């Protein structure tokens, strides 16, 4: 008996120019997270997702898309913008991890101070955040 595996197509395809991707393109499993850095459920899922990535290795392609829910999380959009600023410097995943590991420090003054202390954003990057977020397909909710 030759069982075939079900194949699924993503409604919104993964695009390297827009998405933040970890893992090989040819991985048998693609997991797309629409995440909000201030969401407590996303924060609780973060270590679980890290463990899944660790266990699956090259069998998983993980894709993160910023999805700040501003109606519930007033600091989520600025946190996502900081992640995009870090992305412009090739350091998205470092900032991504930092934001989830320090969810209690997402207020503007903490966010910019931490980002600059970590060397993730420059003053120029902070000024062009709205443009960068639009170019990366930043999902905004209001």
Named regions from a protein language model:
Residues 32-33, 37-116, 121:
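Structural alpha/beta surface segment adjacent to cysteine/selenocysteine redox centers
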Residues 1-32, 115-117, 121-127, 134, ...:
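Non-globular targeting/processing and membrane-anchoring segments
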Residues 41, 131-134:
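Residue-level preference for long, well-ordered alpha-helices that form the structural scaffold
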Residues 69, 129-132:
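Residue-level detector of flexible, active-site-proximal loop/helix-junction positions
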């Amino acid at each position: 008996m030759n069982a075939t595996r079900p194949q699924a197509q993503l409604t919104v395809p993964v695009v390297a120019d827009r998405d933040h991707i970890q893992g090989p393109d040819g991985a048998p499993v693609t997991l797309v997270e629409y995440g909000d850095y201030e969401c407590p459920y996303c924060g609780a899922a973060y270590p679980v997702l890290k463990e899944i990535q660790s266990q699956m290795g090259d069998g998983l392609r993980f894709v993160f898309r910023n999805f700040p829910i501003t109606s519930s999380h007033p600091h989520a959009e600025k946190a996502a913008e900081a992640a995009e600023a870090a992305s412009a410097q090739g350091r998205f995943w470092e900032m991504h991890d930092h934001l989830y590991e320090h969810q209690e420090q997402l207020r503007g003054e903490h966010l910019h101070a931490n980002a600059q202390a970590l060397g993730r954003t420059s003053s120029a990057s902070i000024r062009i955040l709205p443009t960068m977020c639009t170019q990366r397909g930043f999902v905004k909710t209001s």
